[in-house]
């Protein structure tokens, strides 16, 4: 069975195609993505109207490329992200998916974007046992308890203010480094000293919420450090600031993720979201999981950011388990919860 997935929740227009065999195994046939990231760069963040227009312009070319890569004229099913995400962006992708499904005469499946990140993190793993997922991106920082791919997940904790990826973007802008901040800071951090500056780690005390995150204090601390240096006429090491900031973020993320695994008795930790491509996060997560006897499952780098493969993969897994097709009338939901069915 060939399943095509469309992703358009933010600034990437993604179409992925997977092949599902009778045993439930998946093979990636196509991964086509167009990003409007550079159009948002001068604004320092994603502009919803620009993102929606970019999806409209990119959808047909990206679809054609995905079908070319897959070597198929049409799939056996079409799936699309219906939430959470930007309202206009979601409408473009979901509407396109419904139109293609109707034109091809194949079933349509509505997919939860966050569930897609979990599914792709386990794409090359074996059957998923009880697990914890750490989803980290520009819009989300969450710890989720996962019993099976595609089923409703339980939120253990989330950010109380800025998402981790959002903190990266704000610190990058503060340092005049550009957008998006994640890859830029990660690259510079490799040349810096992560112990040069003692930036704070939010909500790490035992009395704090065990599974929640806070990065606003860290962001403010970086701003004050830079302002003080400028006021005193000191030249700062941007590399050291980046390394120390990144170490603080990754320290908190990995510490709390491993603690969540211990608290719920999970033996597998899944990483997902754009920040899961961060080199230090992957490295520190592996170190701490190894020490704790926890298996770490991380997607390929190209599947960490938003893509259509993760949507196709989640839909395919649920189809294999007997999921019914979605009504064509199903709407989009910008605030869709992870605690709802992941395909509906």
From Swiss-Prot:
Its EC number is 2.3.1.234. Its main location: cytoplasm. Fe cation binds at residues 113, 117, 306. Residues 325-344 are annotated as: Disordered. It comes from the Bacteria. Belongs to the KAE1 / TsaD family. This is tRNA N6-adenosine threonylcarbamoyltransferase. It comes from Corynebacterium glutamicum (strain R). The gene is tsaD.
């Amino acid at each position: 069975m060939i399943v095509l997935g469309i992703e358009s929740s933010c600034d990437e227009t993604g179409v992925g195609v997977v092949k599902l065999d009778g045993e439930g195994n998946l093979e990636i046939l196509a991964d086509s993505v167009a990003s409007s990231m550079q159009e948002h760069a001068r604004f320092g963040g994603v502009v919803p109207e620009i993102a929606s227009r970019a999806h409209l312009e990119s959808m047909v070319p990206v679809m054609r490329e995905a079908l070319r890569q897959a070597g198929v004229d049409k799939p056996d099913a079409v799936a699309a992200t219906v939430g959470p995400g930007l309202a206009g962006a979601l409408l473009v992708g979901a509407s396109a998916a419904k139109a293609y499904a109707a034109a091809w005469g194949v079933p349509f499946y509505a997919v939860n974007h966050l569930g897609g990140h979990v599914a792709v993190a386990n794409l090359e793993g074996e059957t998923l046992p009880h697990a914890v997922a750490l989803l980290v991106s520009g819009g989300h920082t969450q710890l989720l308890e996962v019993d099976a791919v595609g089923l409703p997940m339980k939120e253990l904790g989330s950010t109380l203010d800025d998402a981790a990826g959002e903190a990266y973007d704000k610190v990058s802008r503060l340092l005049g480094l550009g957008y998006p901040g994640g890859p830029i800071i990660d690259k510079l951090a490799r040349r810096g000293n992560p112990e040069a500056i003692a930036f704070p780690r939010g909500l790490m005390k035992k009395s704090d919420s065990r599974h929640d995150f806070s990065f606003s204090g860290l962001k403010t601390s970086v701003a004050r450090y830079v302002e003080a240096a400028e006021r005193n006429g000191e030249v700062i090491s941007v590399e050291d600031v980046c390394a120390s900031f990144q170490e603080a973020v990754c320290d908190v993320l990995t510490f709390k993720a491993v603690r969540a695994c211990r608290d719920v008795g999970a033996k597998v930790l899944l990483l997902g979201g754009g920040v899961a491509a961060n080199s230090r996060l992957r490295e520190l997560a592996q170190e701490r999981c190894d020490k704790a006897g926890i298996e770490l499952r991380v997607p390929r780098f190209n599947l960490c950011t938003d893509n259509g493969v993760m949507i196709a993969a989640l839909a395919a897994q649920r189809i294999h388990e007997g999921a019914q097709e979605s009504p064509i009338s199903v709407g989009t939901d910008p605030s869709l919860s992870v605690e709802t069915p992941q395909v509906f």
